[in-house]
Amino acid sequence: MSRTSLEVKAQRKPKFSARAYNRCPVCGRPRAYMRKFGLCRICFRNMALRGELPGVRKSSW
């Protein structure tokens, strides 16, 4: 299946609530989804490095 059809399928209400899963709205990736930001780890990193996510900065210790 193509990624767009899987995104549409994920938006439908499942028969059982345990089957529901989150997808990144930018790229459609189902894994490594961060609920707090609503993005996958790859899109999160790209947007954070570009400064598009307020309050997020690269850690240093």
From Swiss-Prot:
GO terms for biological process: translation. The gene is rpsZ. Transmembrane segments: none annotated. InterPro entries: Ribosomal_uS14, Ribosomal_uS14_bact, Ribosomal_uS14_CS, Ribosomal_uS14_sf. Its cofactor is Zn(2+). This is Small ribosomal subunit protein uS14. SUPFAM superfamilies: Glucocorticoid receptor-like (DNA-binding domain) (SSF57716). GO terms for molecular function: rRNA binding; structural constituent of ribosome; zinc ion binding. Belongs to the universal ribosomal protein uS14 family. Zinc-binding uS14 subfamily. It comes from Nitratidesulfovibrio vulgaris (strain DSM 19637 / Miyazaki F). HAMAP family: Ribosomal_uS14_2_B.
